[in-house]
């Protein structure tokens, strides 16, 4: 089961669109679920995601125009409970102790957060944490040189194989990280 994880698009305020090389990779009919950390910013970005998969879950980012998105969400995909937040609630941004507290409060196997615009994926105390980064490479308050990235999770039974796609220069680099539920 393929799950696309992305966020912080900031279209059209900071970027015009997803990189063309990412659009070529993201084709309709291949992905079953989309988990978005927010800051889509427009209905058009949401409509684009709906063309890729029927099951789209979005949480509200600090720049989203739509107030209909929830602040947080817990989604079950296969054997995994996945928590989804934008990440501006985590202080300081990306703080491990704050993320671990949210993971315990949500009682999830995987916690997905964004906001920092920097990709991260790691295991901590037998739980898995993912920050997909910014799919467009939009700048943030602290940095302008952001590497565009998104994540595809391949969920099979009690294993998640995470593929991170990063646009470095003109090349899409892919890294593989595996997490087994204990």
From Swiss-Prot:
CDD domains from the UniProt entry: MPP_Vps29 (cd07394)
Protein name: Vacuolar protein sorting-associated protein 29
Subcellular location: Cytoplasm; Membrane; Endosome membrane; Early endosome
GO biological process: endocytic recycling; intracellular protein transport; retrograde transport, endosome to Golgi
Subunit and partners: Component of the commander complex consisting of the CCC subcomplex and the retriever subcomplex. Component of the heterotrimeric retriever complex formed by VPS26C, VPS29 and VPS35L; within the complex interacts with VPS35L. Component of the heterotrimeric retromer cargo-selective complex (CSC), also described as vacuolar protein sorting subcomplex (VPS), formed by VPS26 (VPS26A or VPS26B), VPS29 and VPS35. The CSC has a highly elongated structure with VPS26 and VPS29 binding independently at opposite distal ends of VPS35 as central platform.
Entry keyword Hydrolase: no
UniProt GO molecular function: metal ion binding
Keywords of the record: Acetylation, Cytoplasm, Endosome, Membrane, Metal-binding, Protein transport, Transport, Zinc
Family listed: Belongs to the VPS29 family.
Function comment: Component of the commander complex that is essential for endosomal recycling of transmembrane cargos; the commander complex is composed of the CCC subcomplex and the retriever subcomplex. Component of the retriever complex, which is a heterotrimeric complex related to retromer cargo-selective complex (CSC) and essential for retromer-independent retrieval and recycling of numerous cargos such as integrin alpha-5/beta-1 (ITGA5:ITGB1). Component of the retromer cargo-selective complex (CSC).
Membrane topology according to the record: Peripheral membrane protein
PANTHER family per UniProt: VACUOLAR SORTING PROTEIN VPS29
Organism of provenance: Rattus norvegicus (Rat)
GO cellular component, one term: endosome
Pfam families in alphabetical order: Metallophos_2
PTM annotation (N6-acetyllysine): residues: 50
């Amino acid at each position: 089961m393929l799950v696309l994880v992305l966020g912080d698009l900031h279209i059209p305020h900071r970027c015009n669109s997803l990189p063309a090389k990412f659009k070529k990779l993201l084709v309709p009919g291949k992905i079953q679920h989309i988990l978005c950390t927010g800051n889509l910013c427009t209905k058009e970005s949401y409509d684009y995601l709906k063309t890729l998969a029927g099951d789209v879950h979005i949480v509200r980012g600090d720049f989203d125009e739509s107030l209909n998105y929830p602040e947080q969400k817990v989604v079950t995909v296969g054997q995994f409970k996945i928590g989804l937040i934008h990440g501006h609630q985590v202080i300081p941004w990306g703080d491990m102790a704050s993320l671990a507290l949210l993971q315990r409060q949500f009682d999830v196997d995987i916690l997905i957060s964004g906001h920092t615009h920097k990709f991260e994926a790691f295991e901590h105390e037998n739980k898995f944490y993912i920050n997909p980064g910014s799919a467009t490479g939009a700048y943030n308050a602290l940095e302008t040189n952001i590497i565009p990235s998104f994540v595809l999770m391949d969920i099979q039974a009690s294993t998640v194989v995470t593929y991170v796609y990063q646009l470095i220069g003109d090349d899409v680099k892919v890294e593989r990280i595996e997490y087994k539920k204990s």
